[in-house]
Amino acid sequence: MHFTIHNTPGVIHAVRLLCWLVLKLNGWKVINVAPTHGSYLIVAAPHTSNWDFPLGIAMAFHLRLEVYFIGKHTLFKGPAGPIMRWLGGIPLNREASKNFVDTSIEVYTNNENLILAIAPEGTRDSVARWKTGFYHM
């Protein structure tokens, strides 16, 4: 995978400490039940708030998980682009010929020990059902 915060020497330790502090001060208790090796998918649902991302990142760092995520390509434009990639982001253009499932499977099969987080709703809006492509993954 590409260069991320997870493999930036020195920075990762400070970020883990900051994430632990943020979670502790907000009353969160994180229990580690994640696998320690191999590739797997994290289903981040429901994704209904802008706080989902920073809290998810904080939990991943606290648990020492090198998590990657797929996000809408517009999140990766401008000055936010390099930051989102550095945090483990993989852009997805929903209008392109390749769909979400194909892109996810390609990323997943081309990388050993990949932890991929996705929001199956595909939006922060409240929805009655998840997008059906998620079930094929």
What is each PLM-predicted segment?
Residues 14-18, 22, 80-83:
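Hydrophobic alpha-helical segments of integral membrane proteins
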Residues 8-9, 14:
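N-terminal membrane topogenic signal
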Residues 3-8, 25-137:
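Soluble catalytic domains of membrane acyltransferases
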